Amino acid sequence: MSVASLGSRLVPRADTALVAALRADLEAADLTVVAVEDLLGPVAAAALHREQPVAALRATAPDHAGTGPLPTLVRHLLLGAAVDRGALDRALPRLGTAGAERLGLVAAAGRGADDAVRPLIDLRPYAARDAAGAVGWWLASDLGETATGAALPADHVLGVG
């Protein structure tokens, strides 16, 4: 995807190579419902379902969870926390921060490894099981109140749940 402007809104456009790189990175990081709940633990996961992110932020802090791809992506994409460019580049080795910017997923403060990158969307895993078997996917939505600290606008795109 690339991003075009439509008035004050950013409008994503498909770029299949970048989307494929994102998918490969999310799969390699194991950004799944089960892995996220295992990383957070039952208390932080339950709190996050109640829109209380403090325990999840602590569980994904680099000094607690390390700097691997999964804690970085959970902290950034699910919790809406800014991370440094170097950490995001390591978490998304195929897509990189530059590719995530082109997809309209993030906004970087600069090009340096220590420059902050903030998420522009909420991207989280979902899973279901039916007669055909288990399936997992990721769903993008606008950042919620937990990430923005502000009331939702009228044109807010909700996530699921």
Q: How should these model regions be labeled?
A:
Residues 84-160:
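Non-catalytic substrate-recognition/targeting regions of SAM-dependent transferases
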Residues 1-10, 14, 21-48, 53, ...:
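S-adenosylmethionine-dependent methyltransferases
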Residues 16, 23-117:
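Accessory substrate-recognition/RNA-binding modules or partner subunits associated with SAM-dependent
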